[in-house]
């Protein structure tokens, strides 16, 4: 299993994402410039130049035409994927922490941080005929978060709901049409949720939390189905599209990291069985915590982005697919 090392960022990676076909891999980091890579050979196809602060989140739409990014410069930007030009730049009152396109690609949602006297807010915008006037248009929906700020977010099925993960460990489902909370999970996690990723069919999702666990939830009822336990904070988790596997990545906070930690196996990608909750493999590689993980849509490889500024693409050996639990 020989990894591809993608070196194009000067600072730590914040999020990575594949497009629907899996031929493109998008990455963003604290160095202000999101990148796009050809996932097969690791060739960098280009950068999206325009942000003035750390880029915290990104998402690409179903057709790989538009890219949305959110950053610490208090803007969320909509980009043309092919040409790298800014379609629209929407100012916000605090840093943008999460951003996602809906399944249809007609709408996008983004959330802002609770900072500088501003409450966390969730915005939904119409991006069907997006142009530079989008910055002046009123969002389709604006939901203020009075309790804990949003740290991760996903669209529910049929663009009807949004699932949000919060800094206090709560998960909630919001009705997009009414702007109201439909389901609240209560505190399934004891600490903040760092990441949330849907399964291929959207019926369940996995969360990664600072409380050292990752959990599998039902997308409609928010019932906790499985728990994957580790010893350190989990920064990211992803579900395999073809096998009953979950991959977890994390490590201590960046400020607590020492160079000796790599030997202790604190920064490995850890593979768990989706149903049996058992860890069956670890992969080394990063010199620091893993901040983001993503499975390739065909399930034959996965990518990880770390605090060391590298994106690593690992292709699985044939033995990985023959590993049957007994």
Swiss-Prot record:
Subunit: Component of the eukaryotic translation initiation factor 3 (eIF-3) complex. The eIF-3 complex interacts with pix.
Organism, scientific name: Drosophila persimilis
Any GO CC annotation of this UniProt entry: eukaryotic 43S preinitiation complex
InterPro entries documented for this protein: eIF3i, WD40/YVTN_repeat-like_dom_sf, WD40_repeat_CS, WD40_repeat_dom_sf, WD40_rpt
Keywords: Cytoplasm, Initiation factor, Protein biosynthesis, Repeat, WD repeat
Signal peptide: none
Name of the featured protein: Eukaryotic translation initiation factor 3 subunit I
Family in the record: Belongs to the eIF-3 subunit I family.
Compartments where located: Cytoplasm
Superkingdom: Eukaryota
GO function term, MF aspect, one: RNA binding
């Amino acid at each position: 299993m020989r990894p591809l090392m993608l070196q194009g960022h000067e600072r730590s990676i914040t999020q990575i994402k594949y497009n629907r076909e899996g031929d493109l891999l998008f990455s963003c980091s604290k160095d202000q410039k999101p990148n796009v890579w050809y996932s097969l050979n690791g060739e960098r196809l280009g950068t999206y130049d325009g942000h003035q602060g750390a880029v915290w989140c990104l998402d690409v739409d179903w057709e790989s035409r538009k890219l949305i990014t959110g950053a610490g410069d208090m803007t969320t930007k909509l980009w043309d994927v092919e040409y790298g030009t800014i379609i629209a730049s929407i100012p916000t009152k605090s840093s943008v922490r999460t951003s996602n396109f809906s399944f249809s690609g007609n709408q996008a949602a983004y959330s802002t941080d609770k900072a500088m006297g501003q409450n966390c807010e969730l915005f939904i915008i119409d991006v069907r005929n997006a142009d530079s006037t989008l910055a002046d248009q009123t969002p389709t929906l604006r939901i203020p978060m009075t309790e804990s700020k949003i740290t991760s977010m996903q669209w529910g099925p049929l663009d009807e709901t949004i699932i949000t993960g919060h800094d206090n460990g709560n998960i909630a489902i919001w009705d997009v049409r009414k702007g109201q909370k439909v389901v609240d999970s209560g505190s399934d996690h004891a600490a903040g949720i760092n990441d949330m990723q849907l399964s291929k069919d959207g019926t369940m999702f996995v969360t990664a939390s600072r409380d050292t666990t990752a959990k599998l939830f039902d997308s409609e009822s928010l019932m906790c189905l499985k728990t994957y336990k580790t010893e350190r904070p989990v920064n990211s988790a992803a579900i395999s599209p073809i096998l009953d596997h979950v991959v977890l990545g994390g490590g201590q906070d960046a400020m607590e990291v020492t160079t000796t930690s790599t030997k202790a196996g604190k920064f490995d990608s850890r593979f768990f069985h989706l149903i049996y909750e058992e860890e069956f493999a670890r992969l080394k590689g990063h010199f620091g915590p893993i901040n983001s993980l993503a499975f390739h849509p065909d399930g034959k490889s996965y990518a990880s982005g770390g605090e060391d500024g590298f994106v690593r693409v690992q292709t699985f050996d044939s033995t990985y697919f023959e590993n049957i639990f007994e």
